[in-house]
């Protein structure tokens, strides 16, 4: 008998482990259980036979018996052993695709069970080590411990904004263009940096200054954390087998809508999903807590499309939904009661993006599928708004409205100079001056830029984002690049990429930017190469 290789042995162990797991979950009787619930039960069905009445023989000759034909039986019924039977040793997403295509050899019941497992969310508080089989808990904690150190704080971020606000004159255009002449990260190639399995829908650049941490989420609810390596690989071949340090975990059943960190504690991440879930990740202990599942009065989940912490109170979180609702909650109080009393309707359709005005924190801007950009005063309540077809929730007072030709994908406020940027499916970027205390009802842009930002089915929606410490914004380009502009519409940089880096995220304190594409990969641009050359 030929001896199995190490890889084949490991594969057999994985198959055995998966089959044992299915047995423990009692999945074998799932089909019978479903039949019983539907009222169709073959095992308990009794066949009522009619009594045979005695018949008088009439001398009829017996018909000749037909020789029995052998029935087809499966190898399992014949008692024959089949090698490599069970669920293949692949990821959940690959297994789902194989089941749908019929290439995995699984039965119909297996496909139904795969679908059921796929739609089962992570409930309650968990440790990442419980969801990641191939890494030990102590190794995971050691990997992210440096990001949990308190060597930086949200206070540093707000001090930077104050310093910018004290500057009377904007930097020269040439200096800005030099500052944002960024270089592509080259320790690993972008096609090696695969943070998640599917199309990226959210990215986040952690504010740590000592080390870089980039977090991404995809359409299947996976979260990927990339501990960026800054040291170049050795030229003597010692690091030939080294791969990017990426940790993947699945928390949600639908798109990851937003990733951020707590304003009061940057060692904790906050993640939200289209399935209505809001979860935290503690980088110090790698504990993930279930904060809430946003639901309406009928107990249906409301998909969270965007969230942002209040500038006035770091414990207050503002959120928008896929069906047009808005809510603000204090994370220190009981959340359930707040949702029922604070839920407002700001649109009859999806709100894809919203932003808080840093100079007037009681004002927010929303971009919606209803083809409008609206500015709201969330202090003022409006009962039964005339513009809405629904009568389920109260609304807020509308300050100003801009009507777009097509849907508005994103809105973002500049940190200091009262500029609001929006982009949409009409292939434009529009800049608005919102510094006045009395904005007109009909808002008009101060500048309109043509931009290739109409994404298709296979690319995430492109969204313009202002940098949090400078009046500079960036947006991905369908011609495979990241474009950077100042708040006056002057282009500062054009950073080419191999594919469309649709979902971008700024580092809040450094000139670093990351963009995620439709296959789960990340492009990272920094100014560190330029600085090293200047020092030399």
UniProtKB/Swiss-Prot annotation:
One of its GO terms (biological process) is DNA damage response. It comes from the Eukaryota. Residues 36-45 have a biased composition (Basic and acidic residues). WD repeats lie at residues 195-236, 251-291, 346-386, 403-442, 456-495, 496-535. InterPro entries: WD40/YVTN_repeat-like_dom_sf, WD40_repeat_CS, WD40_repeat_dom_sf, WD40_rpt, WD_repeat_DNA-damage-binding. GO terms for cellular component: chromatin; cytoplasm; nuclear periphery. Residues 36-72 are annotated as: Disordered. Pfam families: WD40 (PF00400). Keywords: DNA damage, DNA-binding, Repeat, WD repeat. SUPFAM superfamilies: WD40 repeat-like (SSF50978). The keyword Nucleotidyltransferase does not apply. One of its GO terms (molecular function) is DNA binding. Belongs to the WD repeat DDB2/WDR76 family. DNA-binding protein that binds to both single- and double-stranded DNA. Binds preferentially to UV-damaged DNA. May be involved in DNA-metabolic processes. This is DNA damage-binding protein CMR1. It comes from Vanderwaltozyma polyspora (strain ATCC 22028 / DSM 70294 / BCRC 21397 / CBS 2163 / NBRC 10782 / NRRL Y-8283 / UCD 57-17) (Kluyveromyces polysporus).
């Amino acid at each position: 008998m030929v001896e199995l290789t190490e890889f084949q042995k490991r594969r057999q162990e994985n198959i055995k482990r998966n089959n044992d797991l299915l047995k423990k979950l009692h999945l074998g009787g799932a089909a019978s259980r479903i039949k019983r619930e539907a009222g169709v039960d073959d095992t308990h069905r009794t066949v009522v036979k009619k009594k045979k009445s005695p018949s008088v023989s009439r001398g009829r000759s017996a018909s000749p018996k037909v020789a029995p034909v052998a029935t087809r039986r499966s190898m399992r019924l014949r008692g024959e052993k089949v090698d490599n039977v069970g669920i293949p040793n692949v990821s959940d997403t690959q297994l789902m695709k194989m089941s749908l295509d019929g290439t995995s050899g699984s039965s119909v019941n297996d496909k139904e069970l795969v679908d059921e497992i796929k739609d089962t969310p992570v409930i309650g508080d968990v440790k990442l080590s419980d969801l990641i089989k191939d890494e030990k808990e102590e190794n995971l904690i050691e990997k992210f411990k440096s990001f949990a150190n308190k060597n930086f704080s949200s206070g540093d971020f707000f001090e930077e904004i104050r310093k910018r606000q004290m500057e009377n004159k904007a930097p020269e255009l040439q200096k800005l263009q030099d500052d944002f002449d960024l270089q592509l990260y080259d320790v690993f190639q972008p096609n090696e940096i695969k943070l998640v399995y599917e199309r990226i829908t959210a990215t986040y650049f952690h504010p740590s200054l000592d080390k870089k941490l980039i977090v991404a989420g995809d359409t299947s609810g996976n979260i990927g954390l990339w501990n960026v390596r800054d040291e170049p690989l050795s030229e003597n071949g010692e690091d030939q087998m080294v791969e990017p340090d990426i940790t993947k975990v699945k928390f949600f059943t639908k798109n990851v809508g937003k990733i951020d960190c707590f304003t009061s504690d940057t060692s904790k991440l906050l993640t939200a999903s289209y399935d209505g879930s809001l979860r935290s990740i503690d980088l110090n202990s790698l504990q993930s807590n279930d904060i809430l599942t946003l639901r309406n009065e009928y107990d249906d989940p409301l998909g969270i499309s965007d969230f942002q912490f209040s500038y006035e109170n770091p414990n207050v979180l503002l959120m928008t939904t896929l069906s047009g609702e808005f809510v603000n909650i204090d994370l220190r109080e009981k959340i359930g009661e707040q949702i029922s009393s604070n839920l407002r309707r700001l649109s009859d359709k999806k709100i894809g993006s919203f932003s808080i005005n840093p100079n007037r924190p009681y004002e927010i801007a929303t971009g919606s599928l209803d083809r409008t950009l609206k500015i709201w005063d969330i202090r003022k309540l409006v009962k039964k708004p005339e513009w809405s077809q629904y009568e389920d929730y109260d609304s807020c007072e509308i300050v100003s409205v801009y009507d777009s030709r097509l849907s508005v994908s994103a809105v973002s406020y500049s940190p200091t100079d009262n500029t609001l940027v929006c982009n949409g499916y009409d292939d434009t970027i529009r800049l608005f001056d919102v510094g006045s205390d009395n904005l007109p009802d009909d808002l008009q842009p101060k500048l309109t830029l043509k931009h290739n930002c109409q994404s298709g089915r296979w690319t995430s929606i492109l969204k313009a984002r202002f940098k949090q410490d400078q009046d500079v914004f960036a947006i991905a380009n369908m011609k495979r690049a990241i474009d950077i502009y100042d708040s006056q519409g002057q282009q500062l940089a054009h950073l080419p990429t191999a594919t469309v880096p649709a979902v971008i995220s700024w580092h809040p304190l450094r000139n670093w930017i990351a963009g995620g594409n439709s296959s789960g990969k990340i492009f990272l641009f920094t100014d560190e190469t330029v600085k090293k050359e200047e020092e030399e």
